[in-house]
Amino acid sequence: MDRRTFFGAATIACLGSPFVVRAQKAKEARRIGMLSAGTLSTSEPGPFYEAMRELGWIEGENLIIERRGAAGKSEAVPALAAELVRVHPDLIWTDGAVAGIAAKNATTTIPIVAISGDPVRLGLVSSMSHPGGNITGWSTIAPELAVKRLEILRELIPSATRVGEIVDRANRYWYEVKKDYERAFASLKLQPHFVEITVADAIPGAITEIANGRADALIVRGDPMFGSNREQIARLALQHALPTIAEGRRMPEAGQLLSYGAVGGAAARRIASIVDRILRGAKPGDIPIEQPTEFELVINPKTAKALALTIPQSLQLRAEVLKG
């Protein structure tokens, strides 16, 4: 066999080997970064990953995901954002205001899909319809939602007068909307008890402070810090006999009393669609910020029973009551 024949055969053999096939797949794969002030699980599939799979993006095949979560330490997020930028992802997905702002400060060129409150008030984008720059995403803000949760609380506990709420001090969006929240409480003759914290380790003390302040209920915000610690919050609130009113269905699924917010599966599909469009060449600045249009009320009856609360028929008729 001459040299040309040998190297030709060797090349064909190598191209057909599983090692080269895997290398080709890795070369073709797109890389996305995920950034959160909370915890990003690799073991929990979730509706976002399912939606991505339906769109043809499968982690480990044509998609590489770089996850960076601060585990409730919001001050660590900027460094994690810089770390993500250094691996040169095709896109960065951010969860919450803290992560969105950190990613914006870290890069002006890598596309960012930000899940946040009002991205205009946060300074992430110039407008909802024409974001411009390298950022688009999903706004969890719907002006009526905060009031709606308080209305549900009033329906559930007509005698309630004082309500606790834990706030992540690093979440700049909170300070943008604080006056709106205070007006919402006042409109229903409720007195808020806000407790600001900077790390997840402070959650137990914050709940104790709210309980000692004779609160009738606890509002649980949708910030990543609280989502990542939802089971702990459920357990501690129950120990203090505090009914919890939360933002997303994973909260009552973790043992909290109830939630009212965007339908999780629908939101995940829309966010995955935005990611898909960018991975296929769309410019983030040309993609309007999307907002939820479908909402759900979810109740955990086991928690209601443990709190000796009777859920009014009016709420039961509007809610999905979890089994068990």
Identify what each model region corresponds to.
Residues 1-324:
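Short hydrophobic alpha-helices and adjacent helix-cap/hinge residues
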